[in-house]
Amino acid sequence: MNEFVIDKKAMRQAFSRAAEGYDASAVLQREVCMRMLERLEYIKLQPARLLDAGSGTGWGGRQLAEKYPAAQVISLDIAIGMLQTSKSRSSWWQKLFGGCRQLPVCADVEALPLAANSLDMVWSNLAVQWCNDLPATFVELHRVLKTEGLLMFSTLGPDTLKELRQAFKGVDERSHLNRFADMHDIGDMLVQAGFAEPVMDMEYLTLTYEDVRGVLQDLKAIGAHNTTAGRGQGLMGKAAWARLLENYEKLRRDGKLPATYEVVYGHAWKPAPRVNRDGAAIIKTSFKIK
């Protein structure tokens, strides 16, 4: 097995365990969500049915429900603990009046239990980096969207946690961090999946910490610690831990340890099909008979 393949069972358990305290540590996730919502202001769309893929504790889904009060929001997450926490944090009036408009679904983004051409919009904030087959995932998201439906997402790029990655070099031979796809490769994947007019951009966001434990504790608190097949199964030895601390300390700036995230944003549309089910080309014409 590839050491960088994500162990979905371990990931599901990690996120479920982290659910209760997730929001207190999910600073990056909330900030990126707000930036995605700002981007959404420039897009003219009134979805009747949308999917929040990788909904977590539901904070982003609640923002979408407020923005599109008439829409049904499907909150999908692989971790049942996240969905349970999301339900417990909905306000009383949402539970009383909005329950029929928000539908929780426990499933994997890579295998959606949704009908083809059934959604007007797919929204995914920092979730698709947990997919093992990203090209196939985009094909799946394309499948469930209606024609002229919108895919809007954020994910992490290869420079994410570059300081921690550098600090782990020379410590041992284990796989300590997940690998992330390059923005340009993701754009190519969207086109190959059948999407049109993909727009990609990225930015670096840096969180700062007092010590290495703070970095690792935050990752664990949001369920984002290493769940690859090649991860170590036991605790890190004292010597290895000491080397990690020494390596990371060399990166301290202005009294703080940085943790950089390369945040990648993307959106694309599902165009009208060019051929019908029989493979014949679809040619649209526009003329008037006088």
From Swiss-Prot:
Catalytic reactions on record: malonyl-[ACP] + S-adenosyl-L-methionine = malonyl-[ACP] methyl ester + S-adenosyl-L-homocysteine
Pathway participation: Cofactor biosynthesis; biotin biosynthesis
Enzyme class: transferase
Keywords: Biotin biosynthesis, Methyltransferase, S-adenosyl-L-methionine, Transferase
Cell inner membrane listed as a keyword: no
CDD domains found in the cross-reference section: AdoMet_MTases
Record EC number: 2.1.1.197
Entry GO MF terms: carboxyl-O-methyltransferase activity; malonyl-CoA methyltransferase activity; S-adenosylmethionine-dependent methyltransferase activity
GO terms (BP aspect): biotin biosynthetic process; methylation
Role this protein plays: Converts the free carboxyl group of a malonyl-thioester to its methyl ester by transfer of a methyl group from S-adenosyl-L-methionine (SAM). It allows to synthesize pimeloyl-ACP via the fatty acid synthetic pathway.
NCBIfam families cross-referenced by the UniProt entry: BioC
Protein family: Belongs to the methyltransferase superfamily.
PANTHER family, A to Z: ARGININE-HYDROXYLASE NDUFAF5, MITOCHONDRIAL
Name of the molecule in the record: Malonyl-[acyl-carrier protein] O-methyltransferase
Gene source species: Gallionella capsiferriformans (strain ES-2)
The organism's taxonomic lineage, starting at the top: Bacteria, Pseudomonadati, Pseudomonadota, Betaproteobacteria, Nitrosomonadales
Gene assigned in the entry: bioC
